[in-house]
Amino acid sequence: MSEYQYNKVTPEMIEKFKEIAPKRVLVGDEINEDFTHDEMAIYGKARPEVLVEATSTEEVAAVVKLCNENKVPVTPSGARTGLVGGAVSIGGGVMISLTKMNKILGYDKENFVVKIQSGVLLNDLAQDAEKQGLLYPPDPGEKFATVGGNVATNAGGMRAVKYGCTRDYVRAMTVVLPTGEIVKLGATVSKTSSGYSLLNLMIGSEGTLGIITELTLKVIPAPKSVISLIIPYENLEDCIATVPQFFMHHLAPQALEFMEKEVVMDTEKFLGKQVYPKELEGTEIGAYLLATFDGNSEEQLEDIIEQASEVVLEAGAIDVLVADTPALKKDAWAVRGALLEAIEADTVLLDECDVVVPTNKIAEFLTYTKSLEAEADFRVKSFGHAGDGNLHIYTCSNDMEEGEFKKQVAVFMDKVYAKATKFGGMISG
């Protein structure tokens, strides 16, 4: 936190907040414990002095303006699914919850855009778009995050390998600036070449430049056919080495994920259901690729499956298992979707390293993290987006005392981020 000296919320301010948002202002111990931390409580807890549950841009603006005039800190809050403590009110002050701003305001199907309030959950938008025959392509792992939070962090996700990140689908937004001023950035049209791109400056700014309250998002026609492939390998090295082959052969997976056997087994145990084979024809499996392809016809997908199968088998895959029914595809992706939840359930304390490295460095990078695990008292588990090199590395405390765990993890993180930088990678989350 900066050394800037903020003021405390006064009783007079609380009364004004109650005028702005009647019956939606909580003070002190009235505020639920859930608002003191995000999904990664290891980054600390702090209770805001006041919680305001806003329902409109105008309410957000009025609260922010009052706080600015009185030098009181403001923390915007969505679904609180973040993993880096960004929504924790470490300076006290006022937290503005946007979860009640959850309306899908309407579609413009001729221009392929949808307008929403920023508190809409990603899962709700995805399902609603599907009913319209449309697809909102960004697909972060946490489906119950707010879309505003996705925009504030420029979230990526499984489909980023083909469709890009959240930034690529934001056409316009309404933002409340720190002064309380309401501004509209961007436009419905796809090309805006004039002036500075303040829209893109706001995307990924995590609430530090303003609070996003409304969004106009690009959507696309939903593909008519989607199919997934489970591709097992003897080891992670062969698994990752296959990834460039997809693109060299002009295959364009909608999603391309890697998972090591240990993490898959733990997750299946957590879910109480076995989906992935552990051995095929006497060969022990060490890692998997989970690939999804989409197209406009079954025939097109059949050609893709045939070509993809030839490519991966030649590259060292043990077999190719086709999830060609909705149930099989759902089960395959349910395991991928529950990886983090299963890891969380199996440890007392957890921390995450989120990096992106060149795809040809994934295996070497993960081998390095495993070598560091041998030097530490905690466990390391990993999975990620093979198609774009975005890796999620989790440190699990076992029975370690919290202080010692944090101390060892700090050393681990320094080494891991340094190695990622050496490989030409970056912090990605």
Description of each model-found segment:
Residues M1-K65, G82-F112, V263-V275, P326-E352, ...:
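N-terminal flexible segment immediately upstream of the FAD-binding catalytic core
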Residues P76-R80, A87, S118, P140-G141:
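Glycine-rich, histidine-containing beta strand-loop boundary motifs that form or position
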Residues K103-E257:
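FAD-binding subdomain of flavoenzyme oxidoreductases
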Residues V84-V88, V94-L98, T146, T208-E214, ...:
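Short, acidic (Asp/Glu-rich) active-site segment that either coordinates a divalent metal cofactor
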